[in-house]
């Protein structure tokens, strides 16, 4: 099974368990917080991701963490499953996929907007309203910065890419000019 399918299977399983108790948002908050703890703490990350560390030691660590932060049973069992199957390294990907499932269940589209510089709140709101009007759907906008696009914005959602950047325009012009033969 390829990695993307594996990630999706784990995320769907966690999401379906959360749906049973109608606690999808709570589980997302919890799994995101735990992922942040693991990501931000080098020692914890190395311990949980290491193939050398005994699985029983990892199980004990997850159980101890669960007790200390009052982790829900669903999330605790999920993390134990990842540990037992040596899949803790894909937790961040699972969290991202779970987030996508959560927004999809609420009919909210995740849209990534890339700009060359940090956008002001008014600009972000204007872009969000335009995108929601175009898609006729609520959105969750993730704003990223990539100075290589020079100026403008790039909008990505699903498999769509709308490039309104200076870099994109220059690449289109370059491509067109390469096709044109100069008459002598």
UniProtKB/Swiss-Prot annotation:
Gene this chain is encoded by: atpH
Keywords for the protein's UniProt record, in alphabetical order: ATP synthesis, Cell inner membrane, Cell membrane, CF(1), Hydrogen ion transport, Ion transport, Membrane, Transport
Subunit and partners: F-type ATPases have 2 components, F(1) - the catalytic core - and F(0) - the membrane proton channel. F(1) has five subunits: alpha(3), beta(3), gamma(1), delta(1), epsilon(1). F(0) has three main subunits: a(1), b(2) and c(10-14). The alpha and beta chains form an alternating ring which encloses part of the gamma chain. F(1) is attached to F(0) by a central stalk formed by the gamma and epsilon chains, while a peripheral stalk is formed by the delta and b chains.
GO cellular component: plasma membrane; proton-transporting ATP synthase complex
Source species of the chain: Rickettsia akari (strain Hartford)
PANTHER family: ATP SYNTHASE DELTA CHAIN
Pfam families in alphabetical order: OSCP (PF00213)
GO function terms (MF aspect): proton-transporting ATP synthase activity, rotational mechanism
Localization annotation: Cell inner membrane
Known function: F(1)F(0) ATP synthase produces ATP from ADP in the presence of a proton or sodium gradient. F-type ATPases consist of two structural domains, F(1) containing the extramembraneous catalytic core and F(0) containing the membrane proton channel, linked together by a central stalk and a peripheral stalk. During catalysis, ATP synthesis in the catalytic domain of F(1) is coupled via a rotary mechanism of the central stalk subunits to proton translocation. This protein is part of the stalk that links CF(0) to CF(1). It either transmits conformational changes from CF(0) to CF(1) or is implicated in proton conduction.
Protein name: ATP synthase subunit delta
Family: Belongs to the ATPase delta chain family.
Membrane topology: Peripheral membrane protein
